Amino acid sequence: MLISKKTLAVLIPEITHVSNNEICEKLQQIGIEVEAIRAFKNPDYLQLGILRAVTPHPHDNHLYVCQVQIDKNKQLNVVTGAVNIVDPNNLNKHVIVAKKGAELLNGLIIKTKNIKGIISDGMLCSYVDINPFSKHLIADGDDTHAIVLDNINRDEFGDYLSFLNLDDVVFEVTLPTNRSDLQSLIFLAKELAAVLKRPVFLEQKTTMTLREFYRFPLNLRNRAQANFFGGLFLRDVAITSSPWTTKGLLINQELRPVNCFVDQANMVTVYTGQPIHCHDADKIHGSVELKLATQLETMLALDNKEYEIKPGDLVVADEQGTIAIVGIIGSKRTMVDNTTNNIFFEVVNYNHERIKQTAQRLGVANFASRLMSKPISLQATENCLNYLQNNFLNPESIGKISKFSSTIKAPAFNRKIYLNFNQLRELIGVTKKQLNDHMIRNYLTSLGFKMENQIARAPAYRQDITVWQDISEELLKILDLNKIKEDEILSSTKLEKHEKLNAYDALQKLRTKLQTLGFHNVITYQLISPERARNFNLFGLSNLWEIKNPLSNERSVLRVGLIDSLLRVIQKNAAYKNKLGNIFEFSFVKTKDSNQLHIAALWLEKMFGSTYQKDQGVSVDIPAMKGLAQLIISNFGFNCDFEPITEGEYFTKNVGLKLVVFNEQIGYVGLIKDELLAPYDLKGRPVYGLEINLDRLLNSLNRLERSYTPISKLQDVFKDITFSFPRDESHFETFVKAIKKLQTIFKWELISVFDTEKDGVPITKYTVRYYLKNFTNTPLTLEQIKAVETQLKQQCELAKIALDL
């Protein structure tokens, strides 16, 4: 879901003075997860100007020469091909001009040019020139027409952003799965205003007397099957284009402007969460009814596609056939266009499961179907009708707008819930001083509850409130759980810093090394969808943690790998046209069986590359990835061995390796299979990935084992042993495994290492001192010492370790 700050400001005017970060915090406080914040990148050298004169180009019938005033005493000569400029009604209105030196977001640099004998000092901008990333949302004609703005102060020559609502900020959010009511910006604003402690303005009920001037033929025989079926009728309309302020708001929320009436209806849907179908009333034949389709039928829709209607689909139909697939899309036959004189605004509230099934079968996921595929309350429908009516109520429309075609009775509140305030405080973990009875009543009232002493009645649209424990979650929204003082947790397993064994320092050094190499450290969500959890599960982890009441399916389980999350970061940045780079992340991977620290990295761009010298930099390939893996592992004082992956689920055949330390597999590195990159919009682009389980390395550094034994009065007994390996086959860990098998040796230390030759073969000699454990209070005998020495030699011989006897 997209939330426009400017749209929200209609309901919470003071939100314009609230920082974006605070809005994010408060949205998260009421359970709404903020995925991203979108803000427009403003090109330099663009400004408002006034169109003073337009003449045909003397040498080209498709071009025009414009005089554009950009200051009180300065005009520019601009050649344009925008045909709407020749309309005499546009003279002395404001346009947006790109001056010499401007670099538009599509890469075009504006220069002074001689265009067929006429000097042009700039360019008149269309919306696509300014915001090319929204080209697919531009209304017909607006992609080539120069922007012409009405009702601007005649001396205004400055910033143009506010007149297109490009100074807006849009929050990309995910709603809790049990809060479909928050699809309505009205209900969302009420909760957000409560936690922001700002006034909110929501009510829009008309007090004007409206007449039933037009008996629109609605057949209500099937109305009982719907929560509501009806709408409004508007007559004698003049279809025009919406002002750019309205178009800008719609585009910001990824809705395509159409015309002034359809655009207003779409804005009402944004506020209320209730979709509206707009029909040209004069193109409707006979009566209109809501029904379940009984036979196969095709409908040419507003998007110029044909859709197959099957028995059981919910439709609105006239006597000639279907005019809308409810909650999904309308028919082109009754489309509102420039010839329309009378409009019927159709509103339906019906079982969302049936609409969801039809939308999935048809493969439609548009604005209307996303809303109607979830429950919509009668309060949202009632708000829709009121907002729709008020949007068109003005002196010119009196006598043109009808009453509601059908009555709607939406209860204001839900069932009664009896509250014990002390129980609430105990459940939340606060004192009466922190949350007294008066505060509880005020908080719940600000969230829309009706309070009668210790009885709370939730708003009827709050279907998620069923028991008194649910009320505690509402209070936490206002209290802000993050500000409640924490209780100290006493633990006997506190992390201790040791002067020699400090894993934190090792991780910090590794982070610095990777950042020096140009890798960006990112932090991604631990919670993902069950489907995504199966992606790139390199270590085959199972027994996942599941969230009981997740905000959404997208945040319902704890992940078991990091590469999927990193690929999502690349995908998101690519969608925003940001420059891509190499990234890495440290994060714990948790299952019900384990909790281990991983590092993952994606390498897809040249290291130390240059924009000016394309050949400069370190290209990514498997040797480079081996070097990266070795750098990470050597940071903890270990060496890494590599074993090939001949057939793998995730990496391209023969371009993947297992990472092995002390004969233990700790990670993978390789070229990610191309077909796996398709869901991330990276298919066809080589992406190398790496993921390492750092837990073993960190445990080796951080584990501090203590044993407490009485101080012995006996002298330590120790012996030395010398052994060797061929220099190229030195495996000291083989000796470590051998000596650990002897319970009679309680510690050992390496006292010398040197390289030499034996029979002309280079070897490495090791000398180890080992200490014998005394199980009695008497000195060890020579026989006991000799027995331990013999046992150690036997273990070495079994391990094929050459001893120096």
Swiss-Prot record:
- Where is the tRNA-binding domain positioned along the sequence? 40-162
**Classification via SUPFAM superfamilies:** Class II aaRS and biotin synthetases (SSF55681), Nucleic acid-binding proteins (SSF50249), PheT/TilS domain (SSF56037), Putative DNA-binding domain (SSF46955)
Q: Which GO terms describe its cellular component?
A: phenylalanine-tRNA ligase complex
The reply to whether NAD figures as a keyword in the UniProt entry is: no
What detail does the entry give on cofactor binding? Answer: Binds 2 magnesium ions per tetramer.
Q: Where in the cell?
A: Cytoplasm
This enzyme catalyses: tRNA(Phe) + L-phenylalanine + ATP = L-phenylalanyl-tRNA(Phe) + AMP + diphosphate + H(+)
Residue span(s) of domain B5: 412-486
Which biological process, per GO, is one annotated for this protein? phenylalanyl-tRNA aminoacylation
Q: Which UniProt keywords are present, listed alphabetically?
A: Aminoacyl-tRNA synthetase, ATP-binding, Cytoplasm, Ligase, Magnesium, Metal-binding, Nucleotide-binding, Protein biosynthesis, RNA-binding, tRNA-binding
Q: Name one GO molecular function term.
A: ATP binding
Please list the residues that bind Mg(2+).
D464, D470, E473, E474
The record's comment on protein family reads: Belongs to the phenylalanyl-tRNA synthetase beta subunit family. Type 1 subfamily.
Q: What is this protein called?
A: Phenylalanine--tRNA ligase beta subunit
The organism named in the record is Mycoplasma pneumoniae (strain ATCC 29342 / M129 / Subtype 1)
Gene assigned in the entry: pheT
